[in-house]
Amino acid sequence: MTEPLKPRIDFDGPLEVDQNPKFRAQQTFDENQAQNFAPATLDEAQEEEGQVEAVMDAALRPKRSLWRKMVMGGLALFGASVVGQGVQWTMNAWQTQDWVALGGCAAGALIIGAGVGSVVTEWRRLWRLRQRAHERDEARDLLHSHGTGKGRAFCEKLAQQAGIDQSHPALQRWYASIHETQNDREVVSLYAHLVQPVLDAQARREISRSAAESTLMIAVSPLALVDMAFIAWRNLRLINRIATLYGIELGYYSRLRLFKLVLLNIAFAGASELVREVGMDWMSQDLAARLSTRAAQGIGAGLLTARLGIKAMELCRPLPWIDDDKPRLGDFRRQLIGQVKETLQKGKTPSEK
């Protein structure tokens, strides 16, 4: 308030007027120049990720069709009719003292109650799977937000859902690193770098173990039907374990929905990542000449199991990938190849002796 006012400044020249941008003249390329011309393209990884997210959102979003509404209305009317008829039968049995009919009504009521409870439980678990996609979108918004007050509550909710105890060392380090002056982006980023890797490491170990078991089973077993059943069972078990690690309890329909989303993701992304991560390395090492056909099939099955686990991890994870921390097939490739080679060498050693 006590500082003196600055004196006025007079400019001699006129103000600069914004001029319209000048475009260069049209240039026509001949055939030789056109062959060397390469148009700029979008990042294929970002474009593919956006398309996959759109497919997953469409699959998670319930379809509000007319037939669906008619079926739901018919089921609701049928359920109300069954309840009303059951109440009427119970009253008639009580008035006429027909204890056999009354016992049948009680048994029917227990069966209907168990069925309704199962439907409600399945719906709640399926709703929880859908909420995980919304939580991932919320985390993505918080990672670009400069506000305060929402990041800490959001991260504490994620830790509670995952079953991380308040005395866990990673959570204690996160609490010690945050303070009131940090915005939501910084708080969520600290959680992603300090607490989330604990769950990610456990999921990676599950994926690595399942991929190794699939690889060795295919490489050793001579029965294709047994191999297919084993791989299907191991993949479903892997999805259940990954979902449990990230705090998602799967029911029957939610398990089918998650498995469908994983297969959709893999089919939509195609085999480009598999070829990019594995193809050149296999050609360079000439594994086809070193390993048997069954061993090569085992490595392929193990890599597909690893890819399935990575996609399940991506769908169940509450946070988007940050700083290129997404696991890659190359992380599991060398381990699978080393285990197959070690198994084959152990099998050849006794025969040589």
UniProtKB/Swiss-Prot annotation:
Give the Periplasmic compartment stretches of this protein: 1-69, 121-212
Name where it's found: Cell inner membrane
Instruction: Name the keywords, alphabetized.
Output: Cell inner membrane, Cell membrane, Membrane, Transmembrane, Transmembrane helix
Query: Which Gene Ontology CC terms are recorded?
Result: plasma membrane
Topology in the membrane?
A: Multi-pass membrane protein
Report the Pfam families cross-referenced here.
Answer: DUF697
**Cytoplasmic-side segments:** 91-99, 234-353
Similarity-based family: Belongs to the UPF0283 family.
For this entry, the protein name equals: UPF0283 membrane protein YcjF
Task: Write down the species.
Answer: Escherichia coli (strain K12)
Phylogenetic placement of the source organism: Bacteria, Pseudomonadati, Pseudomonadota, Gammaproteobacteria, Enterobacterales
